[in-house]
Amino acid sequence: MHARVNPAGSAAGTDPSAARSAYYERIARLNLKPLWEVLAALVPPAPVTDAVPALWRWQDTQPLLMESGRLITAREAERRVLILENPGLAGQFTCTPTIYAGLQLILPGEVAPAHRHTQSALRFVVDGEGAYTAVDGERVTMSPGDFIVTPMWTWHDHGNPGGEPVIWLDGLDIQVVRLLGAQFRDGHDSDSQSVARPEGDALARYGSNMLPDGFAPRNGVTPIFSYPYRQSRAALFALKEGPRHRCHGVKMRYVNPATGGAPMPTIGTFLQLLPAGFSGAPYRSTDAAVFSVVEGSVRVELDDRRIDAGPKDQFVIPSWYRYRLHAAEDTVLFSFSDRPIQLALHLWREHEGDA
């Protein structure tokens, strides 16, 4: 007589859960897993993330950064940074699942030694004057609001010959490069790389609505590495009285002048103006974004919480979180995300409104 089998595939009279558990234990020893047990989690109907909205207040981070300057030198640390770790991603040293962010301090007289790595990096100057970043043989003086690019595998170092501490926001694609198994880093023979070009050379050569005759873009990386805030701010305020986006106010994206694309292949960067009295419509997108308040203050309304951020504060909005921006005064926000990756893979989505 043959055993009668029910539709679930187990013999009549037996406990299917016990049979399945025994089966799962057997296949686990062969490094096999049943997809049907995890399919809903692996392929959800909408984005799911462990990251949560979070705020880092300048009144908290600035004193702690200065304390770090008394505890360890820039040379000892190589990069003296306090990581903005998302509380939903504790222990992962990251702000979003794909974007690392941190606040870096360099004191007067210090040099953060030259190195290079396969991760692309950005610097957004938050506080202080007189420091510099050197990238690929050219130095640029750093001022608050400046956006600076360190392309992958280019030598870069930082120094502060000025008289005051300088703090900037770092953003890197560390998690993306780690996921791809392509992490490399190399130290320079000297603390400071040799300067081969005068300051402003790249900006004049590639950022003046012209390109050198015969120039060919390389690797999708911007040929200029400094985007001065004075120019970017002037553009925003020139557009203040014109049409504005109902969710973002006046929002502009930084571009590679050679291609019109993002300055870096993996990180998109943006600057936006919320005019005084602005109350934005609800918005969400698949790229989680890190924000820095440059001027003014902003109230961010999310479905389950509110963030009130002022000058030099940083905050993060995870993927597919619906939010609204409100500003009582003219407010400028810098932000960055992994949007270029999502666009290249045809994954990026956005939605305006409540529905």
Per-range role (PLM):
Residues 2-96, 186, 193-266, 270:
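A short, N-terminal "cap"/entry segment at the start of jelly-roll beta-barrel domains
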Residues 89-100, 107-121, 137, 259-268, ...:
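A short beta-loop-beta micro-motif enriched in histidine and acidic residues
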Residues 104, 122-124, 149, 163-182, ...:
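A short hydrophobic beta-strand segment most commonly corresponding to one strand
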Residues 104, 272, 315:
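Conserved GNAT-family N-acetyltransferase fold
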Residues 107-144, 150-154, 159, 284-311:
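A short beta-strand-loop-beta hairpin characteristic of the jelly-roll/cupin
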Residues 135, 141-162, 168-173, 276, ...:
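Conserved metal-binding segment of the jelly-roll/cupin
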Residues 148-205:
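Contiguous mid-protein beta-loop-alpha structural module that forms a pocket-lining wall or clamp
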Residues 258-260, 267-273, 283-286, 296, ...:
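C-terminal structured domain segments across diverse proteins
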